[in-house]
């Protein structure tokens, strides 16, 4: 059975916070942020919008895009590091909101790589015949766990949610290969106590090495080469990290998603948010070979070779 994406949706808050806005509250500048990260602005949720609200809104759009109802969903998986509370899970909030009365529901935590973990967990459940339709959501309100006095982290993050419905697709479409990985010895480089703490140099070295390597490995598993790749959707963390992955695949700039300028790093939601952007712009077409790749705290990573279409 081939498993792929039947529908996709996203939600981003309306409030835009630019680099110039941040100049007013911390020792930074638009030039400093842009040259180091590629970010110009980010969306920030106000106090009335929480992780589950964003997740529900993205889920509704994904269901509409898939042409199914909540009752057709068998499992809900939510990747998040900023749940509204320890329990109930964000997935359970979604279950009630969309009327998915037949669905099991749980959250999972793999930081910014969480969406990749959720996507492959869903694919495995469907491929084994356990479930037919699985809703996978990445949703994070990182603005509530960053120290707004720390310019090294506060400038990076934005809020948002992205969702996909996964199910059976036609032969040759969907997930062709994948890789999930973790290196717990690097957990000390990116973690949260009260606020997000990051050793930027070590995370950068890890990400540059791992993103390119994992892209090449999933291509090899699928019996494909980098010449076969039509489009790259990396986790939107840092422009220099993303460029390193693109260069490893020998792709021109127009074949890589670059939404970080508008949305910043939205953690588990960054890949589906970027995919919606590229679909709307017509840069992802039916039959395209797409590489999705992400990394996050843990340290964790994941990559998927995906043939777009149903």
Curated annotation (Swiss-Prot):
Can you say where in the cell this protein is located? Cytoplasm
Extract the GO molecular function terms from the UniProt entry.
3-oxoacyl-[acyl-carrier-protein] synthase activity; beta-ketoacyl-acyl-carrier-protein synthase III activity
Q: Name one GO biological process term.
A: fatty acid biosynthetic process
- Give an example GO cellular component term for this record: cytoplasm
Residues at the active site: 112, 235, 265
Query: EC annotation?
Result: 2.3.1.180
- Reaction equations catalysed: malonyl-[ACP] + acetyl-CoA + H(+) = 3-oxobutanoyl-[ACP] + CO2 + CoA
Looking up Pfam families in the UniProt record yields: ACP_syn_III (PF08545), ACP_syn_III_C (PF08541)
- Indicate the principal place this protein occupies in or around the cell: cytoplasm
ACP-binding: annotated span: 236-240
Keywords from UniProt, A to Z, are: Acyltransferase, Cytoplasm, Fatty acid biosynthesis, Fatty acid metabolism, Lipid biosynthesis, Lipid metabolism, Multifunctional enzyme, Transferase
Question: Which pathway, per its entry?
Answer: Lipid metabolism; fatty acid biosynthesis
Q: What is known of its domains?
A: The last Arg residue of the ACP-binding site is essential for the weak association between ACP/AcpP and FabH.
Functionally, this protein is described as follows: Catalyzes the condensation reaction of fatty acid synthesis by the addition to an acyl acceptor of two carbons from malonyl-ACP. Catalyzes the first condensation reaction which initiates fatty acid synthesis and may therefore play a role in governing the total rate of fatty acid production. Possesses both acetoacetyl-ACP synthase and acetyl transacylase activities. Its substrate specificity determines the biosynthesis of branched-chain and/or straight-chain of fatty acids.
Q: How does it assemble?
A: Homodimer.
Family matches, as HAMAP family: FabH
Q: Which family does it belong to?
A: Belongs to the thiolase-like superfamily. FabH family.
This one is known as: Beta-ketoacyl-[acyl-carrier-protein] synthase III 1
């Amino acid at each position: 059975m081939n498993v792929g994406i039947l529908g996709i949706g996203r939600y981003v808050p309306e409030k835009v916070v630019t680099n110039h806005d941040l100049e007013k509250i911390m020792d930074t500048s638009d030039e400093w942020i842009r040259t180091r990260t590629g970010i110009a602005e980010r969306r920030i949720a106000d106090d009335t919008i929480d992780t589950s609200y964003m997740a529900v809104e993205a889920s509704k759009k994904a269901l509409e895009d898939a042409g199914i109802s909540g009752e057709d969903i068998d499992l809900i998986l939510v990747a998040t590091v900023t749940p509204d509370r320890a329990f109930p899970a964000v997935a359970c909030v979604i279950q009630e909101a969309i009327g998915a009365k037949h669905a099991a529901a749980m959250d999972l935590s793999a930081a910014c790589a969480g969406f990749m973990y959720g996507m492959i967990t869903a694919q495995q459940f469907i491929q084994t015949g356990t479930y037919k339709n699985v809703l996978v959501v990445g949703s994070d309100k990182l603005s509530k766990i960053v120290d707004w006095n720390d310019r090294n982290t506060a400038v990076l993050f934005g809020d948002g949610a992205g969702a996909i419905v996964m199910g059976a697709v036609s032969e040759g479409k969907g997930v062709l290969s994948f890789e999930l990985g973790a290196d717990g010895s690097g957990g000390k480089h990116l973690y949260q106590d009260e606020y997000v703490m990051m050793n930027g140099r070590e995370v950068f070295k890890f990400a540059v090495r791992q993103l390119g390597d994992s892209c090449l490995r999933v291509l090899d598993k699928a019996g494909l080469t980098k010449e076969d790749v039509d489009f790259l959707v990396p986790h939107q963390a840092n422009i220099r990290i993303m460029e390193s992955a693109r260069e490893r695949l020998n792709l021109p700039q127009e074949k890589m998603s670059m939404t970080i300028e508008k949305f910043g790093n939205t953690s588990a939601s960054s890949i589906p948010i970027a995919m919606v952007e590229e679909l709307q712009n017509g840069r992802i077409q039916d039959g395209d070979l797409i590489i999705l790749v992400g990394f996050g705290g843990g340290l964790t990573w994941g990559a998927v070779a995906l043939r777009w279409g149903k």
